[in-house]
A protein has these predicted regions:
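Cytosolic regulatory regions built on CNB/CRP/Popeye-like sensor folds
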Residues: 1-182
Length: 182
């Protein structure tokens, strides 16, 4: 995965009508209020963040592109960052008995890699790109250096993980139920 500067056209794929240089200094990083509101609504990890705080958070992101077929990271890699998809699609996979099992298919607005921020820094799954990706990468130290943003992001990570745990519990109950019936 290679860091890249993103021109306004790429940012526009993520949020319509953006007219900003995303790599500009925080003080000059500006987005239209309607775009900020759209990002807060469509990207759960930023939900509840003030507009000013969101602009500051977006300004510290590293913008990355990854081609279809490539891996973003492998299960058991050490992680210190999470990603927000701007465009493209990834599969989240775990290896079981030597075979990749797909856990989720994620697209624009979804985040991944967040468990490394709240857990033991070890990636819990492999993330494989199925359609060329442009993503924002946020490093733990930059998030933690900004307590107001960190509080909102970690709260939203907790909500996202709780939702995923609920979905996993339902699947597990279904599997156990099917097993008991046979």
């Amino acid at each position: 995965m290679s860091p890249m500067k993103v021109d306004p056209a790429l940012v526009q794929m993520f949020a319509e009508n953006v007219r900003a240089e995303v790599m500009a200094p925080v003080s000059s990083f500006k987005l239209e209020p309607a775009i900020i509101e759209k990002i807060k609504k469509k990207v759960p990890i930023f939900s509840g963040m003030s507009s000013d705080r969101l602009m500051r958070t977006l300004a510290v992101a590293e913008y990355c592109s990854v081609k279809a077929g490539e891996l973003v990271f492998n299960e058991r890699d050490i992680g210190d960052s999470f990603f927000v998809l701007m465009s493209g699609e990834v599969l989240v996979e775990k290896l079981r008995n030597g075979k990749a099992v797909t856990l989720a298919r994620l697209n624009a607005g979804h985040c991944f890699g967040e468990m490394a921020l709240v857990g033991n820094h070890v990636r819990s799954a492999t993330v494989r790109v199925t359609r060329d990706v442009v993503a924002m990468r946020f490093y733990r130290d930059l998030i933690d250096a900004n307590p107001e943003s960190a509080q909102v992001i970690y709260r939203n990570i907790a909500c996202i993980l709780a939702s995923r745990l609920g979905e996993s519990s339902e699947l597990l109950a279904d599997l156990v139920g099917q097993s008991a019936a046979t």
